[in-house]
């Protein structure tokens, strides 16, 4: 039986990584194993090895051609991991760059990963802005709530395009403040 490849996406600050980690812990208690792979971390490792960046948040400022090359290499590495176990790929559906939105999972990455499910984690732009302002561990750009809304809209558009190209289903999960457990239960039902 083929291992599942599930992509979990969301704008920075939406809580997708936290949601995914808590979901994997709960699934493990039920005997269901998933390996979490962060696409950005794999990309960062490749870029850092090449001396292109020093911290993760510099990734989105790389020129598009460099980002595309690094995406392809990261996709190949993750595809190899998916041969061994169920994988959740924690990533961004789109990356906001100075030159416009870049697809987080372009065709050359999708062809490698061939995901079964794409999950978009969302919440209100006000909640995202407050989370970003409260996170001193990251060097994030400050955006207006209207910019965050636009980014979430672009993520939905991109995720549906990914679904069209791969046959993956697309699920939207709301991760509202104080309701993480509800979002975890919803993601568990998608992954079982």
Swiss-Prot record:
Its EC number is 2.7.4.3. It comes from the Archaea. InterPro entries: Adenylate_kinase_AdkA, P-loop_NTPase. Active from 70 to 90 degrees Celsius. It catalyses: AMP + ATP = 2 ADP. GO terms for cellular component: cytoplasm. Belongs to the archaeal adenylate kinase family. This is Adenylate kinase. It comes from Methanotorris igneus (Methanococcus igneus).
